[in-house]
Regions:
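Ferredoxin-reductase
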Residues: 2-97, 101
C-alpha cells in the first residue's frame, strides 16, 4: 500500500461533542489497516468536492493509537465560513464515503 494514496472510507458514526465539535468515526477496511496505523499527534487528510471545488483538509486523529485500526475517529471543529467544516457539520451522514489520505 502506498501511503500517499487516497482511500475511500465509510463514515461509521457521527457524534456531536459540542455545538462546534463533531467526532467522525471512519471504518478502515481490512486491506488498508496497516497503512492507517498511526502515532499520537498524526492527522488524516480528507478530500471532498464541494460546490465544484476540490477541498482538502487535515484533521487530528483522536482515537487510541494502534498499528492496524479497524476504525479511526477525527475531530472536526466548525469554523465560521469554513467550507469543509461547515459541509461536514451540515451534510455529512453515516454511510457516506470520504476520500482519505493515511497519516
Amino acid at each position: 500500500m502506498s501511503v500517499g494514496v487516497l482511500r475511500k472510507l465509510r463514515v461509521q458514526s457521527l457524534r456531536k461533542e459540542t455545538t462546534e465539535g463533531l467526532v467522525v468515526a471512519l471504518e478502515i477496511p481490512q486491506a488498508f489497516r496497516k497503512s492507517f496505523g498511526f502515532k499520537h499527534g498524526q492527522f488524516l487528510t480528507l478530500e471532498k468536492k464541494i460546490n465544484s471545488e476540490i477541498v482538502r483538509r487535515p484533521y487530528s486523529i483522536c482515537s487510541q493509537a494502534v498499528s492496524e485500526p479497524s476504525s479511526l475517529e477525527i475531530g472536526i471543529k466548525k469554523v465560521p465560513g469554513g467550507l469543509f467544516s461547515s459541509w461536514a457539520h451540515q451534510e455529512l451522514s453515516v454511510g457516506d464515503e470520504l476520500d482519505v489520505l493515511p497519516p
